[in-house]
Amino acid sequence: MRSSRSAPDPRASDPLAPGPPGYAHRGLHDGATFIENSLLAFAAALEAGAGIECDLRLTADNQVIVFHDADALRLCGSPAVIARSTLADLARFTVGNHPIPTLPQLLTLVDGHVPLLLEAKVENDVWRFGPALLAALEPYRGRYGVMSFDPRLPRWLKTNAPHIRRGLVVSDRLSNFRRWIAMTLADPQFLSVDIAAIGQPWVARVRRRLPAYCWTVRTPADRALAATHADAHIWEADGRP
């Protein structure tokens, strides 16, 4: 006879659950005083009690920095490519009048007060990125998860650092087959799903066994959609919960 007892909900004990404030996308930024992925934006998110989502890139000398773009043109006015620049090369640039932060600097600032979602911009360099990431994270004792569009990184983490919570970032542009391949390879413990895909039936199926967070929640309409179909909001601007 089949038991009438329902299976436990794996989302109920999600160690990365940020609570009602959700995750501030690239910190709490406004494009003026508080620039995305800056220590000021992260400090503002901390003040608001929000979790922090941010982007990580690897420099030419294997240092992990907090930066979204592949080059420094949009934020720093220089075409310097991050992957071809050393940390010393990048030290002359500023983000909102402050140096580009490193991952250790972010960890020191947060100090376990809120959960972190760390999106690794791997760019086909998993074998360098993985060890550099582990070295930066090793002393940290706060809550965090590492995620990537590239399913090879969570797979690498499963093999080499199974204690790190690993996630897959999923856009709405993936076909069903490519998404299945990515999910199978990554074997994620959580998903970060594009707002354009969050209402699709496959997300509801996945949520029976994994938490699914939603990016990027920017409007009240996005917020309502994410409230129905996601376990946490990754938000900015008017998407704030």
Feature names for model-found ranges:
Residues 1-241:
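Phosphate-group recognition and catalysis centered on beta-loop-alpha active-site segments
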